[in-house]
Amino acid sequence: NYCENYCIYCGFNCHNKIRRAKLNAEEIDKEMAAIAKTGLQEILILTGESRAKSDVKYIGEACKIARKYFKVIGLEVYPMNSDEYAHLHECGADYVTVFQETYNSDKYETLHLAGHKRIFPYRLNAQERALKGGMRGVGFAALLGLDDFRKDAFATGYHAYLLQRKYPHAEIAFSCPRLRPIINNDRINPMDVHEPQLLQVVCAYRLFMPFASITVSTRECERVRDNLVGIAATKISAGVSTGIGSHVEDIEDKGDDQFEISDGRSVDEVYKALLDHDLQPVMN
């Protein structure tokens, strides 16, 4: 959870006084093994945006470890060049998700006060560079609540649509995150993006791109997630932690969470909930 950016809404930002941690290869292996025991066959690897602490080689080694345990590997890391994405693909990564946060470039500058993330165009083009690097799929998201959510949702959808036309083979995915409170700032909230507005965004993505994957994360509560998978969402996470080293008890140097989660159910509990809704759980 080391980061070089100053994003005022994120718990990992470089000026937020939190416990920082970085897992070594042995600790990563332990975490992966613990997660794999739950039955999950897909893993999402995240870092803070610090090339100094989490360089491409380090992320690549994490992908190689993950390949021992999981069929599908996703990345949410800092934007990279095409050759770097190609290296990570060779190490086992299948898809890349990049949150643009907001597509309003003026608002973007007021939210990202320092670090490489301030470079709006470089982040905007990350998904295309990932596809050029051989990634099978790419994910798109705006952090709903930072700016006008309807404009950001429209821009997210159009961004994905343009790349789908240019790269017809690409697997396209949407995430629909709303702002959540962070350590040292529990007043952060998604402003006017309430549950009906979130449903509107999810349904708009589904109507606009019928074959895209739509993820609803543990930022949302159990009730909302259970309802959305019955309407338009296709992927939900389970047994989640946004902290560092939180899946294994004997990792002593644990890092603080990126944000508060709302649905703390285990993999088994989410699996059962899907069955109770007459849905078929698929683990990868």
Model-derived features: where do they sit?
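Auxiliary Fe-S-binding modules of radical SAM enzymes
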Residues: R165-N284
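Surface-exposed amphipathic alpha-helices with a cationic face
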Residues: A36, G60-K68, H89, L131, ...
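Short Fe-S-cluster ligation motifs
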Residues: K30-S50
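Canonical Radical SAM [4Fe-4S] cluster-binding loop centered on the CxxxCxxC motif
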Residues: N1-E27
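Catalytic cores of alpha/beta
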Residues: N81-E90, R136, L146-L162, C221-I231
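Radical SAM/AdoMet-radical enzyme domain recognition
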Residues: C7, Q41-I43, D55-L143
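Conserved strand-turn element in the central/C-terminal portion of the radical SAM core barrel
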Residues: I43, S50-K53, E76, M80, ...
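Glycine-rich tight-turn/loop motif centered on a GG-T
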Residues: H15-K22, A52-K57, Y108-F120, D186-D192, ...
